[in-house]
């Protein structure tokens, strides 16, 4: 971990690689007047919108919608089974399980044609008091239980003892984006009205504590966090149904779930502050988390070490080293297909456009894990056997 100061703000950086966009955004963050204690940068750091992905930002009495990001509540879930991977026939894996999952779960920008039962939606929220969620609710009932696009994925994996695992990466779909964009606009208007020193072109407009706008965003953000969990839970339920039909004697352990795009009130260094985790995972002492690799590489079930210097956080994955556009333009399709085929991984890479999320576009997950050995310890090492990308 490297320590330095920028614009008077201490920075603690676990990342060994940092792109130019991220450096500028770090400088912008360090100029904010309400940063608390220091800025923490995880090893999967790379440029985002306003704040780099892989950043943990602590603030005094303000919340920044773009420091949470557009996919509010995005996160991971994983389930271990009692099935040895070597006992699954190839035809069962490809034709029953993978085909069944694709049939049950809409991918990319697709959604269900009919609204899902409201029992799958978040409970105990006053939706009537929410501007965006109320407007988007009917649409959201068709999005719950859908994967989404980008780096979202469903993987079947095996651990070092050969047991089958299911892993999902997904979030709050279009709902989270609508909430983020709306409240970022609200924050920008407020900041300009009151002559804030935080310029709108930084994409770091904020909502002050004890304002209606802060409370409104906070409630809608919490709904999106819960919606992200509901989304992953429903997908996991339907994947389990597909596997149960193909392998009737299968049993499933309880689901591990953790989010990596959200804000929360927490106590650090003797004070209550708002922690923004954007592409960062909570890693309190003993807390179980999930750090996925890129397509075709290892993923990890981890246990937090509660390191106070990272605000008890760790990375959320490997982190990009190449934009999606650059990956499509520069990577070799045949080479990337061969990498997966050589490992025997069932995949659906067929065209140049599918190269957006291949492993060559990401940092080496093994190096990322080595760089955060003081943040988490590895509980389970997982390797992919089949992958579905959004």
At which residue positions do the language-model features occur?
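Beta-strand elements of modular eukaryotic interaction domains
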Residues: 30
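Domain-length cofactor-binding catalytic modules of enzymes
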Residues: 2-25, 34-39, 47-53, 57, ...
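A generic, well-ordered mixed alpha/beta core segment in the N-terminal half of proteins
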Residues: 67-127
């Amino acid at each position: 971990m490297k320590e330095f100061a920028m614009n008077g703000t201490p920075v603690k950086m676990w990342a060994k690689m940092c792109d130019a966009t991220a450096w500028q955004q770090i400088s912008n963050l360090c100029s904010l007047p309400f940063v608390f204690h220091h800025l923490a940068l995880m090893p999967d750091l790379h440029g985002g919108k306003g704040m780099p992905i892989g950043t943990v930002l602590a603030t005094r009495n303000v919340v920044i919608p773009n420091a949470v990001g557009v996919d509010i509540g995005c996160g991971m879930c994983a389930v271990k089974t009692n099935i040895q991977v070597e006992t699954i026939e190839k035809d069962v894996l490809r034709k029953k399980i993978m085909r069944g999952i694709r049939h049950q779960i809409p991918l990319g920008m697709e959604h269900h044609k009919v609204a899902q039962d409201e029992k799958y939606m978040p409970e105990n929220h006053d939706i009537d008091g929410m501007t965006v969620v109320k407007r988007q609710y009917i649409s959201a009932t068709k999005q719950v239980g859908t994967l989404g696009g980008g780096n979202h994925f469903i993987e079947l994996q095996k651990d070092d003892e050969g047991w089958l695992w299911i892993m999902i990466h997904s979030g709050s779909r279009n709902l989270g984006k609508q909430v983020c964009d709306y409240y970022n606009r609200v924050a920008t208007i407020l900041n300009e009205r009151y002559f804030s020193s935080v310029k709108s072109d930084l994409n770091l407009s904020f909502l002050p504590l004890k304002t209606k706008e802060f409370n409104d965003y906070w409630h809608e953000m919490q709904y999106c966090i819960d919606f992200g969990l509901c989304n992953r839970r429903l997908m996991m339920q339907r994947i389990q149904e597909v596997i149960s039909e193909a392998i009737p004697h299968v049993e499933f352990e309880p689901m591990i779930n953790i989010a990596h795009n959200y804000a929360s009130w927490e106590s650090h260094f003797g004070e209550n502050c708002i922690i923004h985790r954007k592409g960062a995972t909570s890693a309190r002492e003993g807390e179980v988390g999930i750090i996925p690799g890129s397509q075709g590489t290892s993923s990890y079930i981890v246990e937090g070490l509660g390191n106070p210097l990272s605000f008890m956080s760790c990375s959320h994955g490997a982190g990009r080293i190449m934009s999606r556009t650059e990956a499509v333009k520069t990577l070799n399709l045949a080479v990337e297909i061969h990498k997966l085929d050589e490992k025997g991984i069932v995949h659906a890479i067929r065209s140049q456009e599918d190269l957006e999320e291949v492993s060559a576009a990401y940092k080496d997950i093994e190096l990322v894990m080595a760089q955060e050995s003081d943040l988490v310890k590895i509980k389970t090492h997982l390797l992919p056997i089949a992958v579905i990308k959004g």
